[in-house]
Design a protein with these regions (language model features):
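Hydrophobic membrane-insertion alpha-helices, especially the h-region
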Residues: 6-28
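Secreted/periplasmic serine-hydrolase-like ester/acetyl group-modifying domain
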Residues: 132-230
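Membrane-embedded segments
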Residues: 65, 69-149
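A structural signal for isolated positions on well-ordered beta-strands in alpha/beta enzyme cores
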Residues: 63, 116, 231-233
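Residue-level recognition of beta-strand->loop/alpha-helix junctions
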Residues: 90, 236, 265-267
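C-terminal regions of proteins
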Residues: 247-312
Length: 312
């Protein structure tokens, strides 16, 4: 029996070491197109550059969190003209699970007077895998990321987490900043693009599905802001009319968000032409200029930005 236990222990240690070596070789050598159950390629939306920058920032008036709608939709330069300092904590496909994480990690340090929680309803129905991989691939690995990874529970995520931990320590592989040509990173976490890509004007009708896990995380994140006495507003940034109209339960989604706090759906406030969009889901710079001006005006009338400006 002792011999069996010893052999089993030795075999387990050998397999574990072999697995680690295999993941390191796999992540270093295998091209992204051939990767299976592994993804450490990231490069979407300058996530690494954004979170490297925020480590050097303190005390801003406004923080924005959310998906690519956030980092492509809120330009710090426009807010600065109104006397508002801001930082954008958006990341690619950021679901409520990750929004709660990034706010929990940075809001105490940034000490914002207001948080804009940008919501893209589609991401309330995902498992959070894509966004989690993006954060890990950008060097964000701590006990909370590990705990969240176990909650999502995906083999691809575990492999990426293992490689990411080694890469943070030994710098095996350099991570890209962005895959998208024509994108420019602007200090404060924003990604600027003047491009306008052709996109489909007709889409299949569908419903937005909200998972209980994502909704629970969203509510928990808002409650954590309340517990720190940080004011927040929930914002749905505009996306193309054809895309928005394809969802049949938009009013139901509005009721969900309205029940959780001060909420504005700018798909119903603005009616921007397709030329103002980078693609069917994101504004380009011309659209951002109009959207941000309207947002500042709307929230100023509710007393938010007026108070911030008076405090500066």
């Amino acid at each position: 029996m002792k011999k069996f236990v010893f052999r089993f222990f030795f075999f387990s240690v050998f397999c574990s070491l072999f697995y680690v070596v295999l993941i390191l070789l796999y992540g270093t050598i295998v091209p992204a197109s051939f990767a299976v159950n592994f993804n450490y390629f990231g490069g979407m939306g300058f996530t690494r550059q954004r979170f490297d920058e925020v480590s050097k920032i303190k005390n801003v008036d406004l923080v924005v969190a959310g998906s690519s709608h956030a980092y492509r939709g809120y330009d710090p330069r426009i807010f600065k003209k109104s006397g508002i300092s801001m930082f954008n904590l958006g990341s690619s496909s950021q679901s409520p699970l990750q929004t709660r994480y990034v706010l929990g990690k940075y809001v105490t340090k940034l000490k914002p007077k207001l948080v804009i929680v940008d919501v893209y309803p589609v991401l309330f129905g995902v498992d959070g895998l894509e966004s989690q991989i993006d954060l890990i691939s950008s060097g964000l690995i701590d006990k909370d990321i590990v705990a969240l990874s176990f909650k999502i529970n995906n083999i691809k995520l575990y492999n990426t987490l293992l490689f990411g931990a080694f890469n943070n320590e030994f710098h095996i592989k350099k991570q890209k900043l962005s895959d998208n040509q024509g994108d420019t990173y602007i200090p404060g976490g924003y990604v600027q693009s003047f491009r306008h890509l052709q996109f489909k004007k007709t889409r299949f009708k569908q419903n937005v599905n909200i998972s209980a896990t994502q909704l629970e995380a969203f509510k928990a994140g808002l409650n954590e802001l309340r517990s720190q006495q940080i004011k927040f507003v929930i914002i749905q940034a505009p996306f193309s009319r054809s895309n928005y109209a394809s969802y049949q339960n938009n009013d139901e989604i509005d009721r969900v968000f309205s029940s959780l706090g001060e909420y504005y759906n700018f798909n119903k406030i603005l009616n921007l032409p397709d030329s103002m969009y980078y693609d069917d889901s994101h504004l380009n710079q011309r659209g951002v200029n109009i959207y941000n001006a309207k947002l500042i005006d709307t929230l100023s009338k509710r007393g938010h930005f007026r108070k911030l400006s008076m405090n500066n």
